[in-house]
A protein has these predicted regions:
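PDZ/PDZ-like domain segments forming the peptide/carboxylate-binding groove
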Residues: 45-79, 84-86, 149-188, 192-195
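PDZ domains, with a preference for the canonical peptide-binding region formed by the helix
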Residues: 79-107, 188-216
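Residue-level signal for short segments within beta-strands and strand-turn junctions
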Residues: 108-110, 123, 217-219
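PDZ/PDZ-like peptide-tail recognition elements
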Residues: 21-57, 120-164, 168, 206, ...
Length: 240
Protein backbone atom coordinates (compact mmCIF):
# COMPACT_ATOMS: atom_id res chain seq x y z
CA UNK A 1 0.00 0.00 0.00
CA UNK A 2 2.87 2.36 0.77
CA UNK A 3 4.19 2.00 -2.77
CA UNK A 4 0.76 2.82 -4.19
CA UNK A 5 0.52 5.87 -1.93
CA UNK A 6 3.98 7.05 -2.94
CA UNK A 7 3.12 6.57 -6.63
CA UNK A 8 -0.06 8.59 -6.35
CA UNK A 9 1.76 11.32 -4.45
CA UNK A 10 4.42 11.57 -7.16
CA UNK A 11 1.72 11.68 -9.85
CA UNK A 12 -0.25 14.52 -8.25
CA UNK A 13 2.86 16.54 -7.45
CA UNK A 14 4.03 16.19 -11.05
CA UNK A 15 0.62 17.18 -12.41
CA UNK A 16 0.51 20.27 -10.21
CA UNK A 17 3.98 21.30 -11.33
CA UNK A 18 3.02 20.83 -14.99
CA UNK A 19 -0.13 22.93 -14.53
CA UNK A 20 1.85 25.68 -12.81
CA UNK A 21 4.28 25.72 -15.74
CA UNK A 22 1.72 25.62 -18.56
CA UNK A 23 -0.88 28.05 -17.16
CA UNK A 24 1.28 31.19 -17.49
CA UNK A 25 2.20 30.17 -21.02
CA UNK A 26 -1.45 29.82 -21.94
CA UNK A 27 -2.24 33.15 -20.34
CA UNK A 28 0.62 34.80 -22.22
CA UNK A 29 -0.62 33.24 -25.46
CA UNK A 30 -4.10 34.66 -24.85
CA UNK A 31 -2.65 38.09 -24.17
CA UNK A 32 -0.77 38.01 -27.45
CA UNK A 33 -3.74 36.94 -29.53
CA UNK A 34 -6.04 39.52 -27.93
CA UNK A 35 -3.72 42.51 -28.36
CA UNK A 36 -5.77 45.14 -30.27
CA UNK A 37 -4.49 46.64 -33.50
CA UNK A 38 -3.06 50.10 -32.86
CA UNK A 39 -4.43 52.29 -35.63
CA UNK A 40 -3.47 55.82 -36.59
CA UNK A 41 -6.24 58.38 -37.04
CA UNK A 42 -6.35 61.44 -39.28
CA UNK A 43 -9.85 62.76 -38.55
CA UNK A 44 -11.77 61.78 -41.67
CA UNK A 45 -14.28 59.03 -42.33
CA UNK A 46 -16.74 57.54 -44.82
CA UNK A 47 -14.54 56.78 -47.84
CA UNK A 48 -15.93 56.20 -51.34
CA UNK A 49 -14.02 54.64 -54.22
CA UNK A 50 -13.65 56.67 -57.42
CA UNK A 51 -11.89 55.98 -60.71
CA UNK A 52 -8.96 58.16 -59.58
CA UNK A 53 -8.63 57.42 -55.88
CA UNK A 54 -10.67 57.52 -52.70
CA UNK A 55 -13.02 60.39 -51.87
CA UNK A 56 -14.08 61.12 -48.30
CA UNK A 57 -17.31 62.83 -47.28
CA UNK A 58 -16.27 65.12 -44.42
CA UNK A 59 -13.62 66.14 -41.92
CA UNK A 60 -15.09 64.57 -38.80
CA UNK A 61 -12.62 65.67 -36.12
CA UNK A 62 -12.36 69.43 -35.55
CA UNK A 63 -8.72 70.29 -34.91
CA UNK A 64 -7.60 66.86 -36.11
CA UNK A 65 -4.82 66.13 -38.63
CA UNK A 66 -6.96 66.45 -41.77
CA UNK A 67 -8.56 69.63 -40.48
CA UNK A 68 -5.20 71.23 -39.71
CA UNK A 69 -3.89 70.18 -43.13
CA UNK A 70 -6.77 71.99 -44.88
CA UNK A 71 -8.51 68.93 -46.33
CA UNK A 72 -12.27 69.08 -46.89
CA UNK A 73 -14.99 66.62 -47.79
CA UNK A 74 -15.01 65.87 -51.51
CA UNK A 75 -11.21 65.73 -51.81
CA UNK A 76 -10.03 62.62 -53.65
CA UNK A 77 -6.96 61.05 -52.03
CA UNK A 78 -4.45 59.76 -54.58
CA UNK A 79 -1.62 58.67 -52.28
CA UNK A 80 -0.87 58.40 -48.57
CA UNK A 81 2.72 58.48 -47.31
CA UNK A 82 3.97 57.84 -50.83
CA UNK A 83 1.70 54.81 -51.39
CA UNK A 84 -0.85 55.05 -54.24
CA UNK A 85 -4.46 54.68 -53.10
CA UNK A 86 -6.96 52.90 -55.34
CA UNK A 87 -9.68 51.87 -52.87
CA UNK A 88 -10.85 52.40 -49.31
CA UNK A 89 -9.39 49.10 -48.08
CA UNK A 90 -5.92 50.31 -49.01
CA UNK A 91 -6.13 53.55 -47.05
CA UNK A 92 -7.62 51.76 -44.03
CA UNK A 93 -4.76 49.25 -44.13
CA UNK A 94 -2.17 52.01 -44.47
CA UNK A 95 -3.56 53.85 -41.45
CA UNK A 96 -3.23 50.64 -39.43
CA UNK A 97 0.41 50.31 -40.45
CA UNK A 98 1.38 53.98 -40.06
CA UNK A 99 2.95 54.78 -36.66
CA UNK A 100 1.08 57.23 -34.47
CA UNK A 101 2.73 60.64 -34.60
CA UNK A 102 4.26 60.17 -38.04
CA UNK A 103 4.09 63.08 -40.49
CA UNK A 104 3.02 61.94 -43.95
CA UNK A 105 2.38 63.48 -47.35
CA UNK A 106 -1.16 63.20 -48.69
CA UNK A 107 -1.65 63.78 -52.40
CA UNK A 108 -5.20 64.62 -53.43
CA UNK A 109 -7.39 66.21 -56.11
CA UNK A 110 -9.78 69.11 -55.50
CA UNK A 111 -11.76 70.76 -58.29
CA UNK A 112 -9.61 68.97 -60.87
CA UNK A 113 -6.33 70.24 -59.43
CA UNK A 114 -3.71 68.02 -57.83
CA UNK A 115 -2.51 69.17 -54.40
CA UNK A 116 -0.29 67.91 -51.58
CA UNK A 117 -0.73 68.33 -47.84
CA UNK A 118 1.28 67.22 -44.82
CA UNK A 119 -0.43 65.83 -41.75
CA UNK A 120 0.64 64.11 -38.55
CA UNK A 121 -1.31 61.05 -37.45
CA UNK A 122 -2.83 60.80 -33.96
CA UNK A 123 -4.01 58.02 -31.66
CA UNK A 124 -7.59 56.92 -31.14
CA UNK A 125 -7.53 58.43 -27.65
CA UNK A 126 -6.44 61.80 -29.02
CA UNK A 127 -9.07 61.62 -31.75
CA UNK A 128 -11.73 60.95 -29.11
CA UNK A 129 -10.42 63.76 -26.91
CA UNK A 130 -10.68 66.30 -29.74
CA UNK A 131 -14.19 65.14 -30.64
CA UNK A 132 -15.32 65.23 -27.02
CA UNK A 133 -13.79 68.67 -26.56
CA UNK A 134 -15.80 69.99 -29.51
CA UNK A 135 -19.05 68.34 -28.46
CA UNK A 136 -18.75 69.76 -24.94
CA UNK A 137 -17.62 73.27 -25.82
CA UNK A 138 -19.40 75.83 -23.66
CA UNK A 139 -20.62 77.88 -26.64
CA UNK A 140 -22.73 74.98 -27.93
CA UNK A 141 -23.66 74.30 -31.56
CA UNK A 142 -24.79 76.80 -34.16
CA UNK A 143 -28.08 76.68 -36.05
CA UNK A 144 -28.47 77.51 -39.74
CA UNK A 145 -32.09 76.65 -40.45
CA UNK A 146 -32.29 74.08 -43.24
CA UNK A 147 -33.25 70.44 -43.71
CA UNK A 148 -29.87 68.74 -43.99
CA UNK A 149 -31.44 65.60 -45.41
CA UNK A 150 -32.61 67.59 -48.45
CA UNK A 151 -29.15 68.96 -49.32
CA UNK A 152 -27.26 67.22 -52.10
CA UNK A 153 -23.91 67.35 -53.88
CA UNK A 154 -24.27 68.74 -57.42
CA UNK A 155 -22.08 70.14 -60.16
CA UNK A 156 -21.88 73.92 -60.22
CA UNK A 157 -23.23 75.14 -63.59
CA UNK A 158 -20.52 76.14 -66.05
CA UNK A 159 -17.64 74.77 -63.95
CA UNK A 160 -15.81 71.53 -63.19
CA UNK A 161 -16.47 71.90 -59.45
CA UNK A 162 -19.13 70.68 -57.06
CA UNK A 163 -21.22 72.40 -54.45
CA UNK A 164 -24.18 71.59 -52.22
CA UNK A 165 -27.69 72.42 -53.38
CA UNK A 166 -29.97 73.31 -50.49
CA UNK A 167 -33.47 71.92 -50.20
CA UNK A 168 -35.98 73.11 -47.64
CA UNK A 169 -35.10 76.39 -45.91
CA UNK A 170 -36.89 76.73 -42.57
CA UNK A 171 -38.97 79.87 -42.22
CA UNK A 172 -37.81 82.67 -39.91
CA UNK A 173 -34.54 80.89 -39.16
CA UNK A 174 -31.02 82.30 -39.79
CA UNK A 175 -30.71 81.17 -43.43
CA UNK A 176 -34.19 82.40 -44.33
CA UNK A 177 -33.69 85.73 -42.58
CA UNK A 178 -30.42 86.22 -44.48
CA UNK A 179 -32.09 85.64 -47.85
CA UNK A 180 -30.88 82.12 -48.60
CA UNK A 181 -33.29 80.29 -50.90
CA UNK A 182 -34.19 76.73 -51.74
CA UNK A 183 -32.10 75.60 -54.72
CA UNK A 184 -29.11 77.81 -53.87
CA UNK A 185 -25.82 75.98 -54.41
CA UNK A 186 -23.33 76.54 -51.58
CA UNK A 187 -19.70 76.61 -52.73
CA UNK A 188 -18.03 77.95 -49.57
CA UNK A 189 -18.87 78.43 -45.90
CA UNK A 190 -16.90 81.24 -44.30
CA UNK A 191 -14.08 80.67 -46.79
CA UNK A 192 -14.01 76.87 -46.51
CA UNK A 193 -14.75 75.08 -49.82
CA UNK A 194 -17.97 73.09 -49.65
CA UNK A 195 -18.12 70.06 -51.93
CA UNK A 196 -20.32 67.58 -50.01
CA UNK A 197 -23.48 67.86 -47.94
CA UNK A 198 -21.77 66.13 -45.00
CA UNK A 199 -18.96 68.70 -44.98
CA UNK A 200 -21.51 71.52 -45.08
CA UNK A 201 -23.36 70.03 -42.10
CA UNK A 202 -20.10 69.74 -40.14
CA UNK A 203 -19.18 73.37 -40.89
CA UNK A 204 -22.61 74.56 -39.80
CA UNK A 205 -22.23 72.70 -36.51
CA UNK A 206 -18.72 74.03 -36.00
CA UNK A 207 -19.69 77.68 -36.45
CA UNK A 208 -20.04 79.65 -33.23
CA UNK A 209 -23.62 80.45 -32.23
CA UNK A 210 -24.61 84.05 -33.02
CA UNK A 211 -21.52 84.57 -35.17
CA UNK A 212 -21.87 85.96 -38.70
CA UNK A 213 -20.51 83.75 -41.47
CA UNK A 214 -20.11 84.43 -45.18
CA UNK A 215 -21.98 82.02 -47.42
CA UNK A 216 -20.79 81.79 -51.03
CA UNK A 217 -23.58 80.57 -53.29
CA UNK A 218 -24.52 80.12 -56.91
CA UNK A 219 -28.16 80.89 -57.71
CA UNK A 220 -29.85 79.81 -60.91
CA UNK A 221 -32.61 81.91 -62.43
CA UNK A 222 -36.20 80.75 -62.66
CA UNK A 223 -35.77 80.06 -66.38
CA UNK A 224 -33.02 78.03 -68.04
CA UNK A 225 -31.97 81.07 -70.06
CA UNK A 226 -31.58 83.30 -66.99
CA UNK A 227 -27.97 84.06 -66.02
CA UNK A 228 -26.41 82.33 -63.02
CA UNK A 229 -25.72 84.63 -60.07
CA UNK A 230 -22.75 84.33 -57.71
CA UNK A 231 -23.57 85.82 -54.32
CA UNK A 232 -21.89 86.35 -50.96
CA UNK A 233 -24.52 86.28 -48.22
CA UNK A 234 -23.73 87.11 -44.58
CA UNK A 235 -25.67 84.81 -42.26
CA UNK A 236 -25.98 85.43 -38.54
CA UNK A 237 -26.08 81.96 -37.03
CA UNK A 238 -28.52 80.90 -34.35
CA UNK A 239 -28.04 78.33 -31.61
CA UNK A 240 -29.41 74.82 -31.27
Amino acid sequence: MSWIFIGLLVFFVGAAAFTALVAPLRQHSNIITRTPVVKSYIGIDDFNNTDKGVMFEAVTTPGGPADQAGLVGGDVILSFDGQPIQNEDQIEELMEKTPIGKTVDVEYIRDGQKKTAKLTTISQDENRRLTREFERRPEGRAHFGYEDGDAERVEVPGTNTYGVRLGTILRSRPADLAGVKEGDIVTAFDGVPIRTSEEFLMRVRRALPYSTVKLSIVRKGENETDPVEKLEIPVKMGKQ
